[in-house]
């Protein structure tokens, strides 16, 4: 519910910016029913029509970059802060997300002046109870996955996957580059 509250807050803050427009274009890479319900509430509250342009993150990002200043996107909503950071690094995001309401609702580690996190996702570890005991996983951390006992027993997404890049970025922030490099070996 907090995710929806924060997204509603962000949408309401944009309402004044969209006040001169009768509609807003949201490039949307998320696929959650609750988001659609929120957009409907936004339209009911403001009278501003929400046009959803749904697609995969990569395709939407490519379109935004190719269209540049002529992009029809008013908001881009995606599923990982790593994607926001990459878009920011390419210079495609505008600033201005500095309101007191955003600052009070969203911790500094989940926002910049160009993007705001609206949800957190747990990175969980699945296991086969036929091959791994609960005792083996007691106190498990991502760092613990580097233990040699797990060699040949793990399956993860490709290292180029944005979720893995974000995981590695969080490990670097928490443990430093050297420790994370050793972990990744």
Q: Model-predicted segments: where are they?
A:
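Bacterial N-terminal signal peptides
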Residues: 7-16
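Positively charged n-region of N-terminal signal peptides that target proteins for export
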Residues: 1-6
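Extracytoplasmic ligand-binding site segments that recognize negatively charged/polar headgroups
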Residues: 29, 33, 72-185
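Boundary at the C-terminal end of the N-terminal hydrophobic targeting segment
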Residues: 17-21
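Generic anion/oxyanion-binding catalytic loop in active/binding sites
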Residues: 10, 65, 134
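Early extracytoplasmic/lumenal segment of secretory-pathway proteins
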Residues: 22-86
